[in-house]
């Protein structure tokens, strides 16, 4: 059976970009938005002027604020902010077509419960087939048709490959993996590390420090993924290392831009002011820190970011703390 009708929950930049991918892959697409102005601009101008201005949307995409509009969809892509995934899936539940797979595209750790997105989905939608999509992908580039490759993680290989085939176009290549946990851990932790890289850039600490931070951050990401039950090989791929390198290397990254502002002397409130899109790392940092503590996993960079965001320490003191750590073997 092939998929015909995709429903995308969340009409932010990434949700809109994924709607473009689905439409270009030949699917009919219903894009569910919280904001009436988004559905109005898509209907009138074929453009999401709030979150993805300047990108004309495919004709196969229709938008609605009503979750019931997804009732006939045989494939769901869930793309709300990570901290809103539970409420979004709860709203979807009475309208979810039996057997329709839910592809989780939100990256983060839920505050309070410290659960990964797949655990949240399993609680809200017991029995629903779940997959995870993650990888190096800026929304604007994907929406404009620039090429990338991503990980499509699903424990059911046959289903994972079917979903990958349904979403595949020449400029968007999903690679199947069976390690859902590894794929999720990579996506959640890299957002926190991107804030750290932004701070390094904002403080003018140089390219050497930037490269060292990405490398040591990747070690933290890997340790946490393995402690959660993921595979180191998974996070060495697109959903971990690939996503990390992209997110930590460009001010296009919402998380890195927050770090740049913090490194430049702004407060967190100033860094977030005027942003319509969510920097997931801000909400995930305290959850990642708490999760690492619960698993007894050492994550000093993530710890420092969480402390800065919580106002427990200033940027300069956090940097000094990292540079003053005892020397140890690299591996």
UniProtKB/Swiss-Prot annotation:
Recorded metabolic or biological pathway in which this protein acts: Membrane lipid metabolism; glycerophospholipid metabolism
Catalysed transformations (reactions): sn-glycerol 3-phosphate + NAD(+) = dihydroxyacetone phosphate + NADH + H(+); sn-glycerol 3-phosphate + NADP(+) = dihydroxyacetone phosphate + NADPH + H(+)
EC number, as in UniProt: 1.1.1.94
Official protein name in the record: Glycerol-3-phosphate dehydrogenase [NAD(P)+]
Disulfide bonds: none
PROSITE patterns the record matches: NAD_G3PDH
GO biological process: carbohydrate metabolic process; glycerol-3-phosphate biosynthetic process; glycerol-3-phosphate catabolic process; glycerophospholipid metabolic process; phospholipid biosynthetic process
Residues given in the record as NADPH binding sites: 14, 34, 107, 139, 254, 278, 280
PANTHER family linked to this entry: GLYCEROL-3-PHOSPHATE DEHYDROGENASE, GLYCEROL-3-PHOSPHATE DEHYDROGENASE [NAD(+)] 2, CHLOROPLASTIC
Matching SUPFAM superfamilies: 6-phosphogluconate dehydrogenase C-terminal domain-like, NAD(P)-binding Rossmann-fold domains
Location of this chain's protein in the cell: Cytoplasm
Binding site for sn-glycerol 3-phosphate: 107, 135, 137, 190, 243, 253-255
Main location: cytoplasm
Lineage: Bacteria, Pseudomonadati, Pseudomonadota, Alphaproteobacteria, Caulobacterales
Free-text function comment from the UniProt entry: Catalyzes the reduction of the glycolytic intermediate dihydroxyacetone phosphate (DHAP) to sn-glycerol 3-phosphate (G3P), the key precursor for phospholipid synthesis.
Active-site residues, as the UniProt record annotates them: 190
Domain of life: Bacteria
Gene Ontology CC terms, in alphabetical order: cytosol
Entry similarity comment: Belongs to the NAD-dependent glycerol-3-phosphate dehydrogenase family.
Keywords: Cytoplasm, Lipid biosynthesis, Lipid metabolism, NAD, NADP, Nucleotide-binding, Oxidoreductase, Phospholipid biosynthesis, Phospholipid metabolism
GO molecular function annotations of the record: glycerol-3-phosphate dehydrogenase [NAD(P)+] activity; NAD binding
Pfam family, one: NAD_Gly3P_dh_C
UniProt enzyme class: oxidoreductase
């Amino acid at each position: 059976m092939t998929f015909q009708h995709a429903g995308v929950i969340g009409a932010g930049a990434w949700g809109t970009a994924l709607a473009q991918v689905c439409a270009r892959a030949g699917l009919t697409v219903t894009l569910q938005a919280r904001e009436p102005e988004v559905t109005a601009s898509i209907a009138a101008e074929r453009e999401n002027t709030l979150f993805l201005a300047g990108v004309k949307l495919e004709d196969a995409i229709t938008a609605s604020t009503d979750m019931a509009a997804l009732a006939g969809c045989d494939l769901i892509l869930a793309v709300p902010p990570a901290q809103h995934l539970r409420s979004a899936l709860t709203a979807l539940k009475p309208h979810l077509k039996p057997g329709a797979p839910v592809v989780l595209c939100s990256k983060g750790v839920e505050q309070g419960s410290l659960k990964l997105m797949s655990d949240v989905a399993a609680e809200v939608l017991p029995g629903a087939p779940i997959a995870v999509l993650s990888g190096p992908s800026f929304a604007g580039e994907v929406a404009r048709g620039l090429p990338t490759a991503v990980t499509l993680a699903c424990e059911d290989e046959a289903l994972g490959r079917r979903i990958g085939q349904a979403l595949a176009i020449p400029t968007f290549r999903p690679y199947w993996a069976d390690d859902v946990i590894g794929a999720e851990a990579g996506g959640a932790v890299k957002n926190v590390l991107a804030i750290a890289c932004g701070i390094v850039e904002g403080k003018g600490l140089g390219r050497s420090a930037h490269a060292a931070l990405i490398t040591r951050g990747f070690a933290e990401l890997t340790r946490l993924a393995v402690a959660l039950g993921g595979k180191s090989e998974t996070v060495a791929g697109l959903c971990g290392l690939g996503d990390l390198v992209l997110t930590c290397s460009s001010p296009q990254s919402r998380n890195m831009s927050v770090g740049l502002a913090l490194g430049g002397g702004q407060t967190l409130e100033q860094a977030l002011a005027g942003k319509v899109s969510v920097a997931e790392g801000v909400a995930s940092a305290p959850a990642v820190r708490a999760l690492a503590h619960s698993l007894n996993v050492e994550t000093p960079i993530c710890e420092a970011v969480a402390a800065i965001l919580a106002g427990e320490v200033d940027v300069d003191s956090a940097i000094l703390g990292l540079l003053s750590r005892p020397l140890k073997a690299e591996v």
